[in-house]
Amino acid sequence: AYLYRDGKLHQITEDQSMVGEMLRAGAITEEQARSHPYRNVITQAVGTEERLSPVVTRILKTPGDIWLLCSDGLTDMARDEEIAAVLADCQPAAAAEELVHLALQHGGTDNVSVLLLEVKA
């Protein structure tokens, strides 16, 4: 999940994957993570284990916030700066389509799922 607020894109959740853990530990760079052979090996997912260890974060909503929920089909193909530029330039309905188009333009072969939620006053 990402939060677009005041012209900046913030990653709220962290990938619960082998590569995500390596990245957080400083063992690899973001560039290495993008093409790492284990980038799709997940360490926790709903429905795979009897017990989960969810990470819960509370964030106060602010009018104008845009929440982005998306699959790695988007984030593997588009950089945060590109995603932020689309969110800055388009209304949410158009931005969702534009983000899918952006991922496909960059050669995306994975499924691309995008959900945008705009916080109103």
Language-model features: locations:
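ATP/nucleoside-binding phosphotransfer catalytic cores, i.e., glycine-rich phosphate-binding loops
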Residues: 92-93
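Conserved, helical-rich catalytic subdomain that frames metal- and/or nucleotide-binding sites
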Residues: 14-63
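Conserved catalytic micro-motifs used in adenylation/nucleotidyl-transfer and phosphoryl/amide-
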Residues: 1-5, 11
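A short local loop/turn or secondary-structure capping micro-motif enriched for an aromatic residue
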Residues: 1-2, 18-21, 77
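Conserved beta-strand-loop-short alpha-helix elements that form
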Residues: 41-50, 60-86, 100-102, 106, ...
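Residue-level structural signal for beta-strand termini and adjacent loop
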Residues: 7, 14-15, 83
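Short loop segments at secondary-structure junctions
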Residues: 6-8, 119-121
